[in-house]
């Protein structure tokens, strides 16, 4: 399986570039982050015309994740156990979940497309959210692998760890 991941920063603005890149590079599975659209707004037809099926989890103009695959996908999940939500000014377990995780079983591999929260500054509530989110992901992953020791798992995505644009391969490409 040829697997790639890409923060597309709005799939509707980059659908042609994304599909062309996938075909040109013979990508079997693409995990996308920051799709910035609802599932009904995702340009699925362009991917289907190129031979891909798509699983999408998006809520609005923020965040959002998707997986496009030439291989059959099953058991699509749009969150993981313990995944925290976030809403500025709100605390507790009732915070809404953001569209930051989607996974599918593809060719006996659990493929995750993850858009890890940006921590912003150390004193911002979003920093605590990022740490809680990563902790919940680690716990979920440990539990899944302990329960299914033969499970192959790929955790892919935008982990939001680059402190400056210079850490990007080519900032002008976006």
Describe the role of every protein-language-model region.
Residues 9, 36, 117, 160-162:
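Catalytic metal-binding/acid-base residues of hydrolase active sites
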Residues 110-129, 168-174:
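Active-site-proximal loop/helix segment associated with metal-binding centers of metalloenzymes
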Residues 50-51, 133-174:
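Metal-dependent phosphoesterases centered on the DNase I-like endonuclease/exonuclease/phosphatase
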Residues 35-36, 42-121:
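Structured beta-strand-rich core segments of catalytic domains in phosphoester-bond hydrolases
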Residues 10, 14, 96, 129-137:
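Soluble or luminal CAZymes and related metallo-dependent hydrolases
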């Amino acid at each position: 399986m040829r697997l790639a991941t890409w923060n597309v920063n709005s799939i509707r603005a980059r659908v042609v570039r994304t599909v062309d890149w996938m075909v040109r590079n013979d990508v079997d599975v693409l995990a996308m982050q920051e799709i910035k659209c609802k599932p009904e707004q995702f340009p699925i037809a362009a991917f289907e015309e190129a031979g891909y099926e798509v699983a999408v989890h998006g809520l609005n103009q923020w965040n959002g994740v998707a997986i496009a695959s030439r291989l059959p996908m099953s058991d699509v999940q749009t969150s993981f156990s313990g995944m925290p939500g976030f809403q500025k000014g709100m605390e507790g377990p009732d915070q809404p979940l953001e569209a930051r995780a989607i996974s599918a079983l593809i060719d006996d591999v659990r493929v995750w497309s993850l858009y890890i929260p940006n921590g912003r500054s150390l004193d911002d509530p979003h920093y605590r959210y990022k740490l809680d989110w990563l902790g919940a992901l680690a716990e979920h992953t440990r539990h899944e692998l302990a329960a299914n020791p033969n499970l192959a798992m790929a955790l892919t995505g935008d982990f939001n760890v680059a402190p400056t644009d210079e850490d990007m391969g080519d900032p002008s490409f976006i």
